[in-house]
Regions:
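N-terminal amphipathic/hydrophobic targeting modules at extreme N-termini
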Residues: 158-161, 170
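Cys/His-clustered metal-coordination modules, chiefly Zn-binding fingers
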Residues: 84-149, 153-159
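Long, hydrophobic N-terminal alpha-helical segment
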Residues: 1-38
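Local cysteine-cluster metal-coordination motifs and their immediate loop/turn environment
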Residues: 8-20, 47-67, 114-130
Length: 170
């Protein structure tokens, strides 16, 4: 089984603490978090609405199809692709291992994969969660050290791309 996620939700899942648009959205997101924490399911990248969006699709104000959200997905896809050293496209599967989550959270805290966050209504909440070392997150574990100065993480070994410009593994 897989959890279907659109690219910008790769970022949202890093700071999810149980807040959301509606109670139905939060209940659904909590179910997705439980599935990811069980470690038995991979993430499959999708274009458009995903398993997290299901909690909103029945709402009259669902924004999952808006052009701004599609652009947010593209910015997230590009920044996470650069971090991971591979091109992420629909159908790509990722495993939410502890190492994957730490790498993503370190990059998020350092601002290296936050391009998609511009204009998001949740940005201040996510800033606070990242600054706290990701305390209270519902997917994975918080970072072991509180990131008082997130920029110091930009040289962390886990942030090095898997593949260099030669295309070979480091």
């Amino acid at each position: 089984l897989t959890v279907r996620l659109r690219p910008h939700h790769l970022l949202c899942m890093l700071t999810y603490v149980g807040k959301g648009y509606t109670s139905g959205f939060v209940e659904n997101y909590d179910r997705v978090a439980t599935r990811l924490n069980a470690g038995e399911e991979d993430i499959e990248l999708v274009d458009g609405p995903d398993d997290i969006c299901e909690g909103l699709l029945c709402e009259s104000h669902a924004h999952c199809f808006n052009e701004g959200v599609v652009q947010r997905d593209e910015r997230a896809r590009l920044s996470v692709s650069a971090l991971l050293g591979e091109t992420l496209t629909a159908g790509k599967r990722l495993q939410t291992t502890p190492d994957f989550l730490v790498k993503m959270r370190l990059a998020f805290a350092a601002g290296e994969i936050r391009q998609a966050c511009r204009g998001c209504q949740w940005i201040r909440l996510c800033d606070r969660i990242a600054a706290s070392g990701f305390a209270g997150v519902k997917i994975g574990e918080p970072l072991p050290t509180v990131a008082k100065d997130a920029a110091r993480f930009s040289k962390h070994p886990m942030l090095r791309p898997k593949y260099g410009s030669s295309g070979r593994k480091h």
